[in-house]
Each structure stands twice: as structure tokens, then as C-alpha cells.
Amino acid sequence: MKAKEIREMTNRELEAKLDELKEELFNLRFQVATGQIENPMRLKQVRKDIARVKTILRERELNIS
């Protein structure tokens, strides 16, 4: 997910996306622990997507464009 796509979302959509990504991260960590993960790079992608969403939300909170 690109930052441009994230910026086009509303705050509610971002919060929903954040919850979705956190749940996916939880499931991926569980798969790593049990040795069933198919794509280990997805873990890194999800963590970075979470960081992007949190950054955009914080920018909006501080009114930074």
C-alpha cells in the first residue's frame, strides 16, 4: 500500500485499515511461531503499512499537510 493511497482515505477508513493490519500482523506472527508462514516478506510489508497508516493519522492530528 502506497502513502498516496493512504492519504486518500478518510480517518475512519484509516482506523479500520489499521485494525485490519494489526489483526493480520497477529496472525502472521502466529504462523511464524508455528512454522506455517508461506510468505515471510509479508510480515515486513504489514509492519511498514501499519507505520504508514499511523504516520498519516498523526499528521492529520497535528494538521500537517
Curated annotation (Swiss-Prot):
GO molecular function: structural constituent of ribosome
Pfam families in UniProt: Ribosomal_L29 (PF00831)
Record-annotated disulphide pairs: none
GO terms for biological process, alphabetical: translation
GO CC annotations on file: cytosolic large ribosomal subunit
Family per record: Belongs to the universal ribosomal protein uL29 family.
Protein name: Large ribosomal subunit protein uL29
Name of the encoding gene: rpmC
